[in-house]
A protein has these predicted regions:
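Conserved small/polar residues in nucleotide/adenosyl-binding loops
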Residues: 1-5
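Extended, highly charged
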Residues: 7-13
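Betabetaalpha-Me/HNH-type nuclease active-site subdomain
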Residues: 15-59, 63-72, 77, 84-87
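Solvent-exposed, non-transmembrane amphipathic alpha-helical segments
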Residues: 43, 62-64, 85, 94, ...
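Short, surface-exposed, polar/charged, turn-prone segments marking secondary-structure boundaries
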Residues: 49-52, 63, 87-88, 102-105, ...
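Short, intrinsically disordered, mixed-charge
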Residues: 63-66, 77-79, 137-144
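C-terminal, well-folded lobe of enzymatic/effector domains
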Residues: 115-178
Length: 178
């Protein structure tokens, strides 16, 4: 399946509490990919400069528009690395609000419905502390050798994540569907 951009999926598949995410970067990877909007093919943005690697599968929620003018980004906690460009049905458990080079950059934290290792968690407060600390550490340092500043602002619960997803879906609809 070719996903040319965040528009190429039925709106019925994107709800605040049950959505399909597009994975761009597999858990454990140091390669930062982004979906090329012109071709729909993943392109290498960069190899991370630090020795860190993505602590979770990373991608975006199609048919959303966030404050940074990109789709809403999502960390998918899963027991296995998921191949880039895979669709994965998820539900949100929380979010990380952070600053990236002086700009707000929210990251939704989600769980796949079909991963028995993680699908018993329903709020960020339930995940093992070490999993949370790995995510926080990663986003605090992953751009440090590029001389770019990142800082975790706060961790918010499931209700806050659902609200941010609702707003990003509504903004998308206002921009592209009216």
């Amino acid at each position: 399946m070719c996903i040319r951009d965040r528009h190429d999926i039925s709106p019925k598949r994107i709800k605040p509490e049950d959505f399909f995410a597009v994975v761009e970067i597999s858990k454990g990877s140091k390669t930062k990919y982004e979906l090329d909007k012109e071709t729909g093919i993943l392109r290498l943005d960069r190899v991370l400069y630090t020795s860190t690697h993505y602590p979770a599968n990373y991608g975006f929620i199609p048919r959303t528009y966030a404050a940074d003018k990109d789709p809403l980004y999502v960390l998918v906690l899963c027991s296995e690395p998921i191949q880039p460009m895979a669709l994965i049905q998820c539900y949100p458990i929380g979010m990380i609000t952070m600053m990236d080079n002086g700009y707000a950059d929210d990251k939704i934290i989600a769980i796949p419905f079909e991963d028995p290792t993680y699908n018993s968690y329903h709020d960020i407060s339930e995940i093992p502390r070490h999993v949370f600390e790995e995510m926080s550490h990663f986003f605090s340092v992953y751009k440090s050798l590029e001389r770019k500043e990142t800082a975790i602002d706060e961790i918010q619960d499931r209700a806050a994540a659902v609200k941010v997803i609702e707003e990003a879906i509504e903004t998308y609809i206002e921009l592209y569907c009216r």
